[in-house]
C-alpha cells in the first residue's frame, strides 16, 4: 500500500523545481498584463535596467508569462522604481529566447543605472490559451518528508563510522530508482546495505541520503568536504560536481584558513590534483595573512614546498617571508634537509644588504644552516653591487631565474592600494583589513580611486636612490577613461589604468600585477597589465562576456585593488652588449 501511495505522488506531481534563476514577473501594473519587469536570480527578485530596452526584449518577457506578444516596452520606471538589486543591464534579445537570462547583457548584477531606469512592459491581452497550475515546487519538501518519516521502507541502511555509534536508517527503493545518482544504493542485491564512512562525515549522512529524495541539499563550509567525499564514493556526480565548484567559493570565506588547509589535506589524500592546485593558488595569493594566522604552524611541509617557488606569492617583502619560514620551523617538526630545501627557495637578492647582514642576528635558522645562508648572501650581494652588464659578462648569471625576480610584494615600497568605493566604505574596509592582518599600508586618507606613488626602479641596491613615479586609476566608465587619458571600450570596463611619467631604464622591464581584493582582505584573483591597463574580472560567475575571478567574491563586487610593481633585468637589452 505504501509503495502504491508513493507511486501516485510521482504520477500526480511531476517535476521537482520551484522558482528558478531566470523566472520573471510583472509588478505594480494596473492589470495582470503590464508592470515593472522583475527577474529571479540566486534567491532574490530584482529589476532590469532600460538601457537598450526595446520591443524584442519585451516580447521575451510577455511570451514567457503566457501572453502572445508585447505591445509596449517602457523605461524610466514607468511602473514605479523597484527595490533590491538591478539584475540585468543592456539586455539584447532576438525575441525568441525563453527568458531575459538567455539574452545578451552585461551579466548578472552588473549595471550602470539606478531604479529610476527600471524597465517595464505592456503585454497583449491575448494569451496562448494555456493556463497552468504548477505546484511542483512542493514536491521536493514532500519527498524529503517521506524520508524523514522513516516509514514504509524496503531498504535498510546501516551506517558505520569509527568512534561513532552506528546509525540505522531506511529508504524507499521506488523513490531511489527515479534518481540516477542513487544507483549505488538501489542496485544493491537484497534489502540491506552497509555504508562505511569517515567518522567526521557521520553528521552529514542523513542529509546526503535525504538529497536522493528531495534533490535539494544545503552545503556549508563545514559540510562541503564530506558531501563531496560521499558523493564521490556513491556516484552522486551532480552533487560531486556542485561541491567541486563550491570549493573556490568557500575558500575565501574562512579567515582562519582552517578550511583551505583541510581541503588541501583532503586533495592530497584523494589524489585530487585540481583541488590541490586550487588550494595552493589561493594560499599563495593570501600568503601573508596565512603566516599571521594561528594556522601557520599547522601548515604541512609539502604545502610550503609548493608555495615558496611561486612568483605570484603575495607577501609584504622577501624578508617577511623568510621570517615566517623561520617561525614555522621553530613550531613544527621538519628535517634538516627539508629546511634547507625551503631556504633554497627564498629569493635572497630581493633583500637589501642591511637586511642580509642582520639575518645572522635575527634568525634561529641561521646557526644550523650557516653555510647555506653565507652562500645565498654572497649571491645576493653580487646582485646588489655589481652592474647587470658586468654580472652577465663575467659571472654568466642567468638573470631570468626566479631568484632574481620579485614576487607580489605588497609593502608600500612596491605597491599602492586603489579603491573603487566611497570614502565611508573605504574607511570601513581599511579598518576591517588592518584589524585582521597588519600589512602596514598607512593612512586611509591616501586610499582612493586615483593614486600617485613612487617605487625604486629595480630591487638592486644600485638603484636605491633612483625612483620611478606611477599613477594608478580605477576606470569604471568611458568618461573616467577620457578624463585620465586612456583609450577604452565599453566591453572592457571597469579596468585599472597605470602610467609612469619617469624616464625608464632600457635594461629594466616590468611585469606589473593587480591583486583583486574581496571584502578588503582576501585576494581572489591576480591580473596582469596589458600595456597601460589591467582587466578587472567579474566578482561572480555571470552570463557576462567578462571572465569571472578565479575565486568568487560573495559580496558581488570588488571595492579595492592593489597595484604591484615588479621590475626585472632585460637580459637581451642592447645596453648589456
From Swiss-Prot:
GO molecular function, one term: scavenger receptor activity
Domain SRCR: 24-124
Signal sequence annotation: 1-18
Primary location group: secreted
Record-linked Pfam families: BACK (PF07707), SRCR (PF00530)
GO cellular component: extracellular space; membrane
Location in or out of the cell: Secreted; Secreted, Extracellular space, Extracellular matrix
Gene Ontology process terms (BP): cell adhesion
Induction: Up-regulated by TNF and IFNG.
Keywords: Cell adhesion, Disulfide bond, Extracellular matrix, Glycoprotein, Secreted, Signal
Domain called BACK: residue spans: 260-360
SS bonds (residue pairs): 49-113, 62-123, 93-103
Known function: Promotes integrin-mediated cell adhesion. May stimulate host defense against viruses and tumor cells.
Subunit structure: Homodimers and homomultimers. The multimers form ring-like structures with a diameter of 30-40 nm. Binds LGALS1 and LGALS3. Binds ITGB1, COL4A1, COL5A1, COL6A1, FN1 and NID. Interacts with PPIC (in vitro). The unglycosylated form interacts with PDE4DIP isoform 2/MMG8/SMYLE; this interaction may connect a pericentrosomal complex to the gamma-tubulin ring complex (gamma-TuRC) to promote microtubule assembly and acetylation.
Protein name: Galectin-3-binding protein
Natural source organism: Mus musculus
Amino acid at each position: 500500500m505504501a509503495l502504491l501511495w508513493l507511486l501516485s505522488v510521482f504520477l500526480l506531481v511531476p517535476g521537482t523545481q520551484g522558482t528558478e534563476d531566470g523566472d520573471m514577473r510583472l509588478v505594480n501594473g494596473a492589470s495582470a498584463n503590464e508592470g515593472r519587469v522583475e527577474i529571479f536570480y540566486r534567491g532574490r527578485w530584482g529589476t532590469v535596467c532600460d538601457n537598450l530596452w526595446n520591443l524584442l526584449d519585451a516580447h521575451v518577457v510577455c511570451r514567457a508569462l503566457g501572453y502572445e506578444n508585447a505591445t509596449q516596452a517602457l523605461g524610466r520606471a514607468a511602473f514605479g522604481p523597484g527595490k533590491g538589486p538591478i539584475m540585468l543591464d543592456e539586455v539584447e534579445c532576438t525575441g525568441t529566447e525563453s527568458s531575459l537570462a538567455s539574452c545578451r547583457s552585461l551579466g548578472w548584477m552588473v549595471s550602470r543605472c539606478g531604479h529610476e531606469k527600471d524597465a517595464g512592459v505592456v503585454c497583449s491581452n491575448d494569451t496562448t490559451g494555456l493556463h497552468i497550475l504548477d505546484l511542483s515546487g512542493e514536491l521536493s519538501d514532500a519527498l524529503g518528508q517521506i524520508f524523514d518519516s522513516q516509514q514504509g521502507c524496503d531498504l535498510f541502511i546501516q551506517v558505520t563510522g569509527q568512534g561513532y555509534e552506528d546509525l540505522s536508517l531506511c529508504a524507499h527503493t521506488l523513490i531511489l530508482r527515479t534518481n540516477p545518482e542513487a544507483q549505488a544504493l538501489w542496485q544493491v542485491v537484497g534489502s540491506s546495505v552497509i555504508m562505511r564512512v569517515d567518522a567526521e562525515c557521520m553528521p552529514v549522512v542523513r542529509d546526503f541520503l535525504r538529497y536522493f529524495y528531495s534533490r535539494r541539499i544545503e552545503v556549508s563550509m563545514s559540510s562541503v568536504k564530506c558531501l563531496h567525499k560521499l558523493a564521490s564514493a556513491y556516484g552522486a556526480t551532480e552533487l560531486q560536481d556542485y561541491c567541486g565548484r563550491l570549493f573556490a567559493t568557500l575558500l575565501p570565506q574562512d579567515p582562519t584558513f582552517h578550511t583551505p588547509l583541510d581541503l588541501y589535506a583532503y586533495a592530497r589524500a584523494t589524489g585530487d590534483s585540481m583541488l590541490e592546485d586550487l588550494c595552493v593558488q589561493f594560499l599563495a595569493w593570501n600568503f601573508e595573512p596565512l603566516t599571521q594566522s594561528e594556522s601557520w604552524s599547522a601548515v604541512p611541509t609539502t604545502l610550503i614546498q609548493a608555495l615558496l617557488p611561486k612568483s605570484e606569492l603575495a607577501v609584504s617583502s622577501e624578508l617577511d617571508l623568510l621570517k615566517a619560514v623561520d617561525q614555522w620551523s621553530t613550531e613544527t617538526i621538519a628535517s634538516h634537509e627539508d629546511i634547507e630545501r625551503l631556504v633554497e627557495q627564498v629569493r635572497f637578492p630581493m633583500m637589501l644588504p642591511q637586511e642580509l647582514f642582520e639575518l645572522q642576528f635575527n634568525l634561529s635558522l641561521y646557526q644550523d644552516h650557516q653555510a647555506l645562508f653565507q652562500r645565498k648572501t654572497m649571491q645576493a650581494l653580487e646582485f646588489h653591487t655589481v652592474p647587470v652588464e658586468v654580472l652577465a659578462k663575467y659571472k654568466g648569471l642567468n638573470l631570468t631565474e626566479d631568484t632574481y625576480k620579485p614576487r607580489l610584494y605588497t609593502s608600500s615600497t612596491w605597491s599602492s592600494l586603489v579603491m573603487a568605493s566611497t570614502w565611508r566604505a573605504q574607511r570601513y574596509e581599511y579598518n576591517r583589513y588592518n584589524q585582521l592582518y597588519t600589512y602596514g599600508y598607512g593612512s586611509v586618507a591616501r586610499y582612493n580611486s586615483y593614486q600617485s606613488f613612487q617605487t625604486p626602479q629595480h630591487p638592486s641596491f644600485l638603484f636605491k636612490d633612483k625612483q620611478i613615479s606611477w599613477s594608478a586609476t580605477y576606470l569604471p566608465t568611458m568618461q573616467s577613461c577620457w578624463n585620465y587619458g586612456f583609450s577604452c571600450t565599453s566591453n572592457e570596463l571597469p579596468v585599472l589604468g597605470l602610467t609612469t611619467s619617469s624616464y625608464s631604464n632600457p635594461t629594466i622591464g616590468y611585469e606589473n600585477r593587480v591583486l583583486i581584493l574581496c571584502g578588503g582582505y582576501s585576494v581572489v584573483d591576480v591580473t596582469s597589465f596589458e600595456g597601460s591597463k589591467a582587466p578587472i574580472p567579474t566578482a561572480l560567475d555571470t552570463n557576462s562576456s567578462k571572465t569571472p575571478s578565479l575565486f568568487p567574491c560573495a559580496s558581488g563586487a570588488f571595492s579595492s585593488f592593489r597595484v604591484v610593481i615588479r621590475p626585472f633585468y632585460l637580459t637581451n637589452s642592447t645596453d648589456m652588449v
